[in-house]
Regions:
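Short amphipathic, positively biased membrane-proximal segments
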Residues: 1-150
Length: 150
């Protein structure tokens, strides 16, 4: 059986959007279970904007989340041209992203560093797993409309 290794830009965008939405579920669920503020992570992300420093902003956090998710989605798209993805490889890539985002960059921003780290790592793994799943090789006979899944 031949597997398609190509994906459409639309498929990449849809996968990235789904991953961006789903990726906040672990930390949100953890916050709700522990009685913490479920929007704290989004507000903390807002401090990554220039001149926001330690002034958390929900709107700023949404903007940062969309931008960072778009950047990592682009990186996944470029990597998927060379390597096959799936949920497991995507989750592993999510761990690599978490290492960069949380261990190297996030610790420089106190509001990010103060977040429950396990939940943040789970968010990154969820992002990678969902996007990896969206970019998985699909059997060519399963692709609609002339081999395109746009």
């Amino acid at each position: 059986m031949t597997r398609a290794t190509e994906f459409s830009t639309g498929g990449l965008v849809r996968g990235g959007a789904l991953a961006a939405i789903v990726s906040g579920l672990p930390s949100t669920a953890w916050a709700l279970l522990t009685g913490a503020d479920p929007l704290a992570a989004a507000r903390a992300a807002g401090t990554l904007l220039p001149r926001r420093g330690e002034r958390p902003s929900l709107v700023g956090g949404v903007i940062v989340h969309i931008g960072v998710s778009a950047a990592w989605t682009t990186a996944f798209g470029l990597a998927a041209r060379r390597w096959r993805f799936g949920a497991v490889r995507g989750a592993l890539a999510g761990l690599a992203i978490a290492t960069l985002d949380l261990c190297f960059l996030g610790r420089r921003f106190p509001p990010i560093a103060a977040l429950p780290q396990g939940a943040q790592w789970a968010d990154h793994v969820a992002f990678g797993a969902v996007l990896g799943w969206a970019l998985r090789p699909v059997p060519s006979h399963a692709l609609p409309c002339s081999g395109s899944w746009v």
